[in-house]
């Protein structure tokens, strides 16, 4: 028994020494190759891998020694069983060669001893085999778990290396492309500057329009048609404007800030004036039909939405072109002076109009006047026209 165990230990001891030499040589070569291939791997990961490989080698050696001991025990049991079988064979052969001289009692005793001894040897061999199978299962399970852990650790190291490389690339891209924020700031500044320029140009054009209104001729045009036809024409004009009226209204807000421009309302109509005259109210003449406010509202300040407002033709330029062009032929309308208009209204309504002497206007009243109408051309206050029954 002892000789067999020593023999097995000697064999496995030689194998272990050879395996250690091979492992040492393989580790040296692997470290040299790894240093040449993986130069960019972090130092902490490389140290961890080295320690992990050393620990795994030690554990493998321990398990190999345990397996060798188990196999040696099984071999000892097999040798003992063989020796017992040889002894039984010798006893049986000696009894047979002695002839039939022995008693039956001795034969029965010999058979009984042999059966008991064979059963003992069989049970011992079975126990050894069971222990060997269990040891093999444990070793195989440990090896499988070890391989899985190695693969997981290698994946973690690979992911760390990839993340480090990606972070370096991102840093390089950020270093080589630092001008995006500056370009955005320049764009915003240029937009603000262009808006300021457009607002200043519109203010200048409004100033020119006001200067032109002061020198415009004092002519009033009156339509002899009914109010229904006038409302129809206004509806047609608004429908022809279409969706552009929204954008024109926005431009109108920029060109006429505050309450400087006032539209003619129902209070400026002749019917309302006659009804108010019955109640001894004062009356102010309405602004002409073609006023600067209406032109600014119903005529686009620029032909297209894509063109900026400061490149459009101003109202003073349009008025100059209109003055140089040929006059329109309007047979349905006639031009009357202010006296004829007021006389016609007084004759129709049956009231008497008294016109007092004009009074000079103060500077505050002139500032309150709308720069978009022709009211400042007549130089009359609210008390200029009085209606009596």
Swiss-Prot record:
Chain positions covered by the region annotation Calmodulin-binding: 137-151
Region described as Disordered: 347-374
GO molecular function: calmodulin binding
IQ domain sequence ranges: 106-134, 135-157
Coiled coil regions, renumbered to chain: none
Subcellular localization(s) per the UniProt record: Cell membrane; Cytoplasm, Cytoskeleton
Keywords, alphabetical: Calmodulin-binding, Cell membrane, Cytoplasm, Cytoskeleton, Membrane, Repeat
InterPro entries linked to this entry: DUF4005, IQ_motif_EF-hand-BS, P-loop_NTPase
One cellular component term from this protein's GO annotations in UniProt: plasma membrane
Pfam family, one: IQ
Self-association state and partner proteins as the record states: Binds to multiple calmodulin (CaM) in the presence of Ca(2+) and CaM-like proteins.
Function: May be involved in cooperative interactions with calmodulins or calmodulin-like proteins. Recruits calmodulin proteins to microtubules, thus being a potential scaffold in cellular signaling and trafficking. May associate with nucleic acids and regulate gene expression at the transcriptional or post-transcriptional level.
Family that this chain belongs to: Belongs to the IQD family.
Name of protein: Protein IQ-domain 26
Organism for this UniProt entry: Arabidopsis thaliana (Mouse-ear cress)
